[in-house]
């Protein structure tokens, strides 16, 4: 992902490039030499932390890097009870619209749940990428990883334990109020408070 991001940054004007610093680090414990007004955890990255201690360590590291009253935007999915109990292990689902890359490849992304650990709230998932190359070659790429799902009040409790104060919870990136779309997203806006 950093490679793709670096390529994207190189296409930006010099003034933008000079303000961007890419850092590869462990989100559970990182140390940068600066503080920020805003920290985001996009694309459900927080849910790849499958142990509560790791989640707390991550939030403590983020807290340490925010200025006083800085904002954290935490993005996770809102677990659908119907989906959690569905007997769909090994079945592909979630057709997303096909997209075309700049080099002409057509890509369809799907999902698959390989195993479920309901007691620890962990699904082992695969993201499947079906790629059609301009030369006619077909390719299937698989990215496997565990994802721990959290419910709203569990996430709020973790944030409170790490000295964050809830400001808002949204159901989507369009700022739809929580509960207006189900299952939707859980997007938390939390403010750093003194620990």
Go through the PLM ranges and name each one.
Residues 5-6:
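Conserved SAM-binding loop
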Residues 9-13:
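Conserved hydrophobic residues forming the short capping helix/wall of the S-adenosyl-L-methionine
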């Amino acid at each position: 992902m950093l490679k793709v991001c670096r390529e994207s940054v190189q296409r930006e004007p010099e003034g933008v490039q000079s303000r961007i610093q890419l850092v590869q680090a462990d989100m559970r414990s990182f140390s940068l030499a600066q503080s920020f007004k805003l920290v985001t955890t996009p694309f459900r990255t927080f849910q790849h932390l499958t142990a509560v201690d790791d989640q707390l360590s991550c939030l403590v590291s983020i807290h340490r890097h925010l200025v006083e009253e800085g904002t954290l935007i935490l993005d996770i999915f809102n677990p659908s009870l119907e989906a959690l109990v569905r007997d769909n292990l090994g079945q592909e689902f979630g057709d997303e619209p096909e997209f075309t890359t700049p080099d002409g490849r057509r890509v369809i992304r799907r999902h698959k749940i390989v195993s479920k650990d309901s007691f620890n709230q962990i699904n082992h998932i695969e993201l499947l990428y079906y790629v059609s190359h301009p030369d006619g070659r077909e390719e299937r790429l698989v990215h496997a990883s565990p994802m721990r799902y959290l419910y709203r009040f569990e996430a709020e409790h973790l944030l409170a334990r790490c000295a964050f104060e809830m400001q808002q919870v949204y159901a989507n990136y369009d700022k739809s109020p929580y509960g207006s779309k189900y299952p939707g997203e859980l997007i938390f806006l939390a403010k750093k408070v003194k620990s």
